[in-house]
A protein has these predicted regions:
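N-terminal alpha/beta PP-like core and its mobile active-site loop of ThDP/TPP-dependent enzymes
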Residues: 1-171
Length: 171
C-alpha cells in the first residue's frame, strides 16, 4: 500500500474479493472511499437514501449470491441503513457495510462533531454479525479478509466496518 490512502486501498481490496458493485451516497465522511472508486472497475449505484442503499445491497446479494456492499457516512447514514442491516441479519443475507466515522481522536467524547453518534459501533453491532473499527492502515486487510471468510464459512449476515476520516487518509 505504498502511495494509496486507506480509502483507495479498501476499494482495491474489495475488487480483489470480487466485488463489482457498491451502493451508497458520497459524503464528507466517505470521500476517500470515492476517490478510490474513480480508478476502479467497481460500479457505483447512488440511491436517494441510505436505507435504499441497504436494501439495494440486500437485493443484490439475494440475486447474485455475492455479498452486497454499501458505503455510508457516519450518523444519519448509518442509522438510515440499520433497517436493511437488521433484515439482512434475520434473513441471513451477506452484506458488507463500510461507514465513515469522525476522527479517531474524537470518538466516544461526545464533542458534537458533524453527524456524531455517541456509540456508532454499538448501534451497528445490534444489527450485524460483528462491527469493527479500523484505527491503523494495517488493520484493514485482515478485517476485510475476516468479513469475506465469514460470509463464505458461517451463517451469512451483515458485517460492519467503520473507518475514521483521519485513518481513511493515511497511507
Amino acid at each position: 500500500m505504498t502511495h494509496k490512502t486507506v480509502g483507495e486501498h479498501l476499494v482495491e481490496l474489495l475488487e480483489l474479493q470480487g466485488v463489482d458493485t457498491v451502493f451508497g451516497i458520497p459524503g464528507v465522511h466517505t470521500i476517500e472511499l470515492y476517490r478510490g472508486l474513480g480508478s476502479s472497475k467497481i460500479r457505483h449505484i447512488t440511491p436517494r437514501h441510505e436505507q435504499g442503499a441497504g436494501f439495494m445491497a440486500d437485493g443484490y446479494a439475494r440475486a447474485s449470491g455475492k455479498p452486497g456492499v454499501a458505503f455510508v457516512i457516519t450518523g444519519p447514514g448509518l442509522t438510515n441503513i440499520i433497517t436493511a442491516m437488521a433484515q439482512a441479519k434475520l434473513d441471513s443475507v451477506p452484506m458488507l457495510v463500510i461507514s465513515g466515522v469522525n476522527r479517531s481522536d474524537t470518538l466516544g467524547k461526545n464533542l458534537g462533531f458533524l453527524h456524531e453518534l455517541p456509540d456508532q459501533q454499538g448501534l451497528a453491532e445490534r444489527a450485524s454479525l460483528w462491527s469493527r473499527i479500523i484505527f491503523k492502515p494495517e488493520e484493514l486487510e485482515p478485517a476485510l479478509n475476516d468479513a469475506f471468510r465469514d460470509f463464505a464459512t458461517k451463517r451469512p449476515g451483515p458485517i460492519h466496518i467503520q473507518i475514521p476520516t483521519d485513518v481513511m487518509k493515511l497511507h
